């Protein structure tokens, strides 16, 4: 027969760190649109690549809209696909 020994129960308190909410770099009045070049240019690297959502601090929905706006601006020749290093 097995003898079971009950371990004393301890209450564990997790040290909760406060979650910081980062303010979105896009203001409430700014609209994500392919024509808004001043906004779009902030989310493109020097090489012309689209920056990731972590770097941008955008939500996933905002990142999706921004990516579509950048691609649309590239197709309409408002933005270059590549930047020359010359």
UniProtKB/Swiss-Prot annotation:
SUPFAM superfamilies (alphabetical): Ribosomal protein S18
GO cellular component, one term: chloroplast
Major subcellular site: plastid
InterPro entries on file: Ribosomal_bS18, Ribosomal_bS18_CS, Ribosomal_bS18_sf
GO molecular function: small ribosomal subunit rRNA binding; structural constituent of ribosome
GO BP terms in the entry: translation
Family matches, as Pfam families: Ribosomal_S18
Coiled coil: none
Keywords from the UniProt entry: Chloroplast, Plastid, Ribonucleoprotein, Ribosomal protein, RNA-binding, rRNA-binding
Keyword rRNA-binding appears in the UniProt entry: yes
Subcellular location(s) of the protein: Plastid, Chloroplast
Gene3D superfamilies (alphabetical): Ribosomal protein S18 (4.10.640.10)
Keyword rRNA-binding on entry: yes
Family: Belongs to the bacterial ribosomal protein bS18 family.
Subunit organization: Part of the 30S ribosomal subunit.
Descriptive protein name: Small ribosomal subunit protein bS18c
Organism: Larix occidentalis (Western larch)
